[in-house]
């Protein structure tokens, strides 16, 4: 049961003052933040949080994907990159700070239909890798054989390889060849000859376009979209994506209808 620390509810979305219990820089300008609160019990792999910047001049909340979830300790791990003034403020917050958090938001990845003996492919790129960690962990717990291919610009940018390697077979690519396989995730995936029961991906638009094309007709292939947001509740339509099949509706909202969509459903 959620206590009074969750001040408001908007449908399934809650507002809570969560506590910052740990933070560290894990790569240049990329930080790992651990928050504690009762909201954690409601979180699913692939969802995100909308966090208020503790600065009166910053009006919009920042959407940050949930990387790992630990209901037992009521903590969640977020990984974010400093992109501007708001995220720079996050990186300087002292341990014990309280943050106004709205969430958990988004539909997340549906992992309930996979189990023992099945295979899943996880594809991530750059700062799109973090939300896939909990996906890999949960699939592993369900007995799924997990193959992970993640791509980064260079060796210094590689993150979360150790965490993923604990639950999956991991292949890392770098654009410049300074670590792992030289090239892109497509370099590795195009050489694979095995079939997968499900595909989960998150990353830059170019990578997601590749995944959408290659697995366009796969019945269980999913892409998680990154988008700029304003309200985070679907009211402002600032994060709209367009549908391939417009017979019913022309668009969907990343914050409310996503961020996870099936391949072959949206225009990339």
Language-model regions, residue ranges each:
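Structural signal for conserved beta-strand scaffold positions within catalytic alpha/beta enzyme cores
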Residues: 22, 68, 172-174, 223-225, ...
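A charged, well-structured terminal subsegment
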Residues: 185, 251, 262-268
